[in-house]
UniProtKB/Swiss-Prot annotation:
SUPFAM superfamilies: Actin-like ATPase domain, Heat shock protein 70kD (HSP70), C-terminal subdomain, Heat shock protein 70kD (HSP70), peptide-binding domain. PANTHER family: HEAT SHOCK PROTEIN 70KDA (PTHR19375). Chaperone involved in the maturation of iron-sulfur cluster-containing proteins. Has a low intrinsic ATPase activity which is markedly stimulated by HscB. Involved in the maturation of IscU. PROSITE patterns: HSP70_1, HSP70_2, HSP70_3. It comes from the Bacteria. The gene is hscA. One of its GO terms (molecular function) is ATP binding. Gene3D superfamilies: 1.20.1270.10, 3.30.420.40, Actin, Chain A, domain 4, Substrate Binding Domain Of DNAk, Chain A, domain 1. Belongs to the heat shock protein 70 family. GO terms for biological process: iron-sulfur cluster assembly. It comes from Salmonella dublin (strain CT_02021853). This is Chaperone protein HscA. Keywords: ATP-binding, Chaperone, Nucleotide-binding.
Length: 616
């Protein structure tokens, strides 16, 4: 198998010259930066030896702090201390407030409905906050490496949509970083473990971080990483464990007032500390807001059991998509700090029937994989044999006549990818075509997600079916989609890059996939009906034009038979009987065969008129 070179053009390092690159795990709760030194990938610590950087920014009128210093201010200045900003990326203000009604921030909407956070430093959006975190990580890397970074690979959840991915790239650009690539977090973990273990076969990457959950099923073979399927939830993570435990402590302490932000932060801090302690101890003492009590691991397990079960349901769906049984999985890689929770490890082990891998620190493994990939992409390993194949989570396609969806790129297709299909005009003289880009697994437009619309104009006015429009879908390595439509005879074209303003709702992707299975039979029948109705409309449209042009070729009796057949077809096409519509179309075809032959003869005679036999 010939492998593609994935180094970017122009980035090959000169002999003996090493470029500085870093991998960044931009996490919901904590972030890390890593690099490759002396052939080994390692995360970079701060001056106090701490590798994790809390994804928290504290804003003041005269500046801001990032990380531990910012987190320490959270209880005293909650409104100006922004944490878990990753959850806000690519979402509308209404969406954020509906999902997280108890966030202690002062929100305002921008003109496009996106969130702005009112802080002492002014109105800030999630991209700006993320950029400040990235700047702190880049500064740590530059200081450790004694030079400016030539490029970075930043990891994102596999289920991040175009808006969320673009927001991440915008944040990096704002931070002054050159993004070599966005990399799915589970894929980064696979790189780290694949290089370390050298195993071949199917591996499951279970990634439960602070704010997101991802499950990826990968095949590793001879250094080739192929993602067979992905699943997960873009709004489920260890933060949810913390909030459930905080609410439980609130109930036990009898604290009814939710308006005191300081108490809110104290409760959350107590919950986080208790969760960490319960990973090693069976019981923990809690002292918060004047209340003292005891929480057991069993009580904590009861609180989070339903959430852990949700992750396993996503695992089951991903395995089904990949065509793999749990017993076929060689190893299960645990990623994310939340996988330290004993119940998580226990349930995952039971589900896959094997003890999960935790050899690499689950907090660091994603950053390490990103650093390895950055080292390759920046040109330090031009002869690397590693090829990375990501996939798109949902099918991409177009709306066609009758409200149908024509899939152009099926879900779980490896990226980057480009696919094209040819379409044609429906009406005589049609000079424009509306392109409606869809995402989803169902057969009808009403059951899929609309991504974008644009129009192709300047199509030559030809008979129906005469113009040929090639529509090309291209998904780049970051999962961003561009669609181009071109009329082949003239070369006129139009295109669009799909960047939805908001992200998918919780569970929307999983729900869309589940619905496609549940309604498969119903969808096929609906598609068959819609296709027959479109064909009926096409036949009637064509017949109307033919009768307008050449009705003189028919006798009164022949015209009556054709009109009756057309009227019958028009009537049955309003109903839902697929067979009746099909038979009515066949009847129109039968009644018009002689008419079609006469029109053909007439066209031939007109074409030959004035020409000699020799000329023919």
């Amino acid at each position: 198998m010939a492998l593609l070179q994935i180094s970017e053009p122009g980035l090959s390092a000169a002999p003996h010259q090493r470029r500085l690159a870093a991998g960044i795990d931009l996490g919901t709760t904590n972030s890390l930066v890593a690099t490759v030194r002396s052939g080994q990938a390692e995360t970079l610590p701060d001056h106090e030896g701490r590798h994790l950087l809390p994804s928290v920014v504290h804003y003041q009128q005269q500046g801001h702090t990032v990380g531990y210093a910012a987190r320490d201010n959270a209880a005293q200045d909650t409104a100006n201390t922004i944490s878990s900003v990753k959850r806000m990326m690519g979402r509308s203000l209404a969406d954020i407030q509906a999902r997280y009604p108890h966030l202690p921030y002062r929100f305002k909407a921008s003109v496009n409905g996106l969130p702005m956070i009112d802080t002492a430093a002014g109105l800030l959006n999630p991209v700006r906050v993320s950029a400040d975190i990235l700047k702190a990580l880049a500064a740590r890397a530059s200081e450790s490496l004694s030079g400016e970074l030539d490029g970075v690979v930043i990891t994102v959840p596999a289920y991040f949509d175009d808006a969320q991915r673009q927001g991440t790239k915008d944040a990096a650009r704002l931070a002054g970083l050159h993004v070599l690539r966005l990399l799915n977090e589970p894929t980064a973990a696979a790189i780290a473990y694949g290089l370390d273990s050298g195993k071949e076969g199917v591996i499951a990457v279970y990634d439960l971080g602070g704010g997101t959950f991802d499950i990826s099923i990968l095949r590793l073979s001879r250094g080739v990483f192929e993602v067979l399927a992905t699943g997960g939830d873009s709004a489920l993570g260890g933060d949810d464990f913390d909030h459930l435990l905080a609410d439980y402590i609130r109930e036990q302490a009898g604290i009814a007032d939710r308006s005191d932000n300081r108490v809110q932060r104290e409760l959350l801090d107590a919950a986080i500390a208790a969760k960490i302690a319960l990973s090693d101890a069976d019981t923990v003492r809690v002292n918060v807001a004047g209340w003292q009590g005891e929480i057991t691991r069993e009580q904590f397990n009861d609180l989070i059991s339903a959430l852990v079960k949700r992750t396993l349901l996503a695992c089951r769906r991903a395995l089904k998509d990949a065509g793999v049984d749990p017993q076929d999985v060689l190893e299960v890689v645990m990623v994310g700090g939340s996988t330290r929770v004993p119940l998580v490890r226990e349930r995952v082990g039971e589900f896959f029937g094997r003890t999960p891998l935790t050899a690499i620190d689950p907090d660091k493994v994603v950053a390490i994989g990103a650093a390895i990939q950055a080292d390759i992409l920046v040109g330090n390993k031009p002869d690397s044999e590693m090829l990375l194949l990501d996939v798109i989570p949902l099918s991409l396609g177009l709306e066609t006549m009758g409200g149908l969806v024509e899939k152009v790129i099926p879900r779980n297709t490896t990226i980057p990818v480009a696919r094209a299909q040819d379409f044609t005009t429906f009406k005589d003289g049609q000079t424009a075509m509306s392109i409606h880009v869809m995402q989803g697994e169902r057969e009808l437009v009403q059951d899929c997600r609309s991504l974008a619309r644009f129009a192709l104009r300047g199509i030559p006015p030809l008979p129906a079916g005469g113009a040929h429009i090639r529509v090309t879908f291209q998904v780049d390595a970051d999962g961003l989609l561009s669609v181009t439509a071109m009329e082949k005879s003239t070369g006129v074209e139009a295109s669009i890059q799909v960047k939805p303003s908001y992200g998918l709702t919780d569970g929307e992707i999983a729900s869309m996939i589940k619905d496609s299975m549940s309604f498969a039979e119903q969808d096929v029948k609906a598609r068959m009906l819609a296709e027959q109705k479109v064909e009926a409309a096409r036949v009637l449209e064509s017949l109307t034009g033919a009768l307008t042009a050449d009705a003189a070729l028919l006798s009164a009796a022949e015209r009556q038979c054709i009109d009756d057949a057309a009227a019958h077809l028009s009537a049955v096409a309003q109903g839902d009987d697929v067979d009746a519509i099909e038979q009515a179309i066949k009847n129109v075809d039968k009644q018009t065969q002689e008419f079609a032959a006469r029109r053909m003869d007439q066209s031939v005679r007109r074409a030959l008129k004035g020409h000699s036999v020799d000329e023919v």
